[in-house]
């Protein structure tokens, strides 16, 4: 069985756009041909695809960096460079994607085949055919391709189960799953047998079905990370219905009502109150001698608290009460689905592109880092420099004019820059000239 991994950190880098071309027409009867440099191709984007065949983020445990290809450079005769292929990465249905540095939610993949563009490829640089003017009919200017987006992401998997089995360790959750589905969880008579969630499909004789997850046993303090704790409570978030199993084994040394309240409190104290989910109370392990007496005390305690919800008595060993529990669970799942559909119609976008918050236009800072050294920082300015082809004098002069229009020269003077001082914008260093 593959290792269950439900959290991971990865880095994704989309492809750079291809560089624009500086070229001119050279034809037999056109001795002074105009510009003919084509545009670069778009860089490859990185796209997550929800795959129902995956159950874990294990594929990302040993490979943490993913890079898409760059676009092809522009060509002569005004030909465009070829766009790079997008890089598709399969993730399990139920994967939530966050920006690792900011914690911002980027997207949630909840349907098979749903796509999420997490890093967009850079656009291709323009060739010199775009820069011809009446004054400069033969421009030696072309843009470099735009850098692709580079992000560090945190992936979280929250199982998409209709029903979640919760309760203390060794209350019979795995056994119930094994007798109602084809899932084969590890079962033994000691605590924390289930170390990873198990998922199975319950199919009833009347044709109804629902998915059910056996979640690792909870103990007091789970919502704060005690035991297997908070790392598995997240899997309860997506469930429609909770089956709350309470052991009627008189030999476990615990009061059933206390077990019930402990688990309810942990669900309530989770970051999103899980105790409000619809639940069925299940008295498990009713085949054990003395279980009837413990059940009577449990029902009495619930009634005294004003809780008149039915208690389902089951034994997964003898199958007593299991059929009725599964039928009533299916009915409750249908009720919850109907309620949700009425509250908010389900609309799932097939492909979604996350739009990262753009910096304020032309926002930059100037810092004096040495006696004659200055550093200019600003995401858009640095991108402008990266897209400037510095191999041609026309390109350098165009960049200088744009920096001046954006107020960089004035800002440098205000910081004390004089002729001959070094100024760095990203990796580009130039000499300041007033």
Swiss-Prot record:
* PROSITE patterns per record: G_OBG, GTP1_OBG, OBG, OCT
Mind telling me which GO cellular component terms the entry cites? cytoplasm
UniProt: Mg(2+) binding residues: 174, 194
Summarize where GTP binds, as residue positions.
Answer: 167-174, 192-196, 214-217, 284-287, 315-317
Which residues are in the OBG-type G domain? 161-334
Localization recorded for this chain is: Cytoplasm
**EC identifiers of the protein:** 3.6.5.-
Q: Name one GO molecular function term.
A: magnesium ion binding
Q: Name one GO biological process term.
A: ribosome biogenesis
- What protein is this chain from? GTPase Obg
Q: Which residues form a coiled coil?
A: none
Q: Keywords for this entry? A: Cytoplasm, GTP-binding, Hydrolase, Magnesium, Metal-binding, Nucleotide-binding
Q: Obg domain location, by residue?
A: 2-160
Q: Which cofactor does it need?
A: Mg(2+)
Query: Is the keyword Amino-acid biosynthesis in the record?
Result: no
Main location group:
cytoplasm
Q: Subunit structure of this entry?
A: Monomer.
Q: Which InterPro entries has this protein been placed in? A: G_OBG, GTP-bd, GTP-bd_Obg/CgtA, GTP-bd_prot_GTP1/OBG_C_sf, GTP1-OBG_CS, GTP1_OBG_dom, GTP1_OBG_dom_sf, OBG_GTPase
| Organism per entry | Lactobacillus helveticus (strain DPC 4571)
Which purpose does this protein serve, as stated in its record?
An essential GTPase which binds GTP, GDP and possibly (p)ppGpp with moderate affinity, with high nucleotide exchange rates and a fairly low GTP hydrolysis rate. Plays a role in control of the cell cycle, stress response, ribosome biogenesis and in those bacteria that undergo differentiation, in morphogenesis control.
> Which family does the record assign?
Belongs to the TRAFAC class OBG-HflX-like GTPase superfamily. OBG GTPase family.
Do the record's keywords include Protease? no
């Amino acid at each position: 069985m593959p290792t269950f991994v439900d959290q991971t950190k990865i880095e994704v880098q989309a492809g750079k756009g291809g560089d624009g071309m500086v070229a001119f027409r050279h034809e037999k009867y056109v001795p002074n041909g105009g510009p003919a440099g084509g545009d670069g191709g778009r860089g490859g984007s990185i796209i997550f695809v929800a795959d129902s065949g995956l159950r874990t983020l294990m594929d990302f445990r040993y490979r943490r960096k993913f890079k898409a290809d760059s676009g092809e450079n522009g060509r002569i005769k005004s030909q465009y460079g070829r766009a790079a292929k997008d890089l598709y990465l399969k993730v399990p249905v139920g994967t939530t994607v966050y920006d690792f540095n900011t914690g911002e939610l980027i997207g949630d993949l909840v349907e098979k085949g749903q796509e999420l563009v997490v890093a967009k490829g850079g656009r291709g640089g323009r060739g010199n055919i775009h820069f011809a003017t009446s004054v400069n009919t033969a421009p030696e200017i072309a843009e470099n391709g735009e850098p692709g987006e580079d992000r560090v992401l945190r992936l979280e998997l929250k199982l998409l189960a209709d029903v979640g089995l919760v309760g203390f360790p060794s209350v019979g959750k795995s056994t119930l799953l094994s007798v109602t589905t084809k899932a084969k969880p590890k079962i033994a008579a000691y605590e924390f047998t289930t170390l990873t969630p198990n998922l199975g499909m319950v199919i009833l004789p009347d044709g109804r079905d629902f998915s059910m997850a056996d979640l690792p046993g909870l103990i007091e303090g789970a919502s704060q990370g005690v035991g297997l704790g908070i790392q598995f409570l997240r899997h309860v978030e997506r469930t429609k219905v909770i089956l709350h199993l309470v052991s009627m084994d008189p030999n476990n040394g615990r009061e059933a009502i206390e077990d019930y309240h402990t688990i309810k409190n942990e669900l309530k104290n989770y970051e999103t109150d899980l105790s409000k989910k619809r639940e069925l109370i299940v008295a498990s392990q009713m085949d054990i001698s003395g279980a009837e007496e413990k059940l009577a005390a449990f029902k009495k305690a619930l009634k005294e608290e004003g809780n008149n919800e039915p208690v389902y008595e089951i034994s997964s060993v003898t199958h007593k009460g299991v059929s009725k529990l599964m039928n009533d669970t299916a009915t409750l799942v249908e009720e919850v689905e109907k309620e949700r559909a009425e509250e908010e119609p389900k609309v799932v976008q097939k492909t979604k592109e996350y739009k990262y918050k753009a910096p304020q236009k032309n926002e930059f800072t100037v810092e004096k880092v040495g006696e004659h050294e200055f550093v200019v920082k600003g995401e858009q300015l640095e991108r402008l420099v990266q897209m400037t082809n510095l191999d041609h004098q026309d390109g350098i002069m165009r960049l200088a004019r744009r920096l001046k229009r954006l107020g960089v020269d004035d800002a440098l003077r205000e910081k004390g820059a004089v002729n001959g001082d070094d100024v760095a914008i990203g990796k580009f260093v130039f000499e300041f000239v007033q």
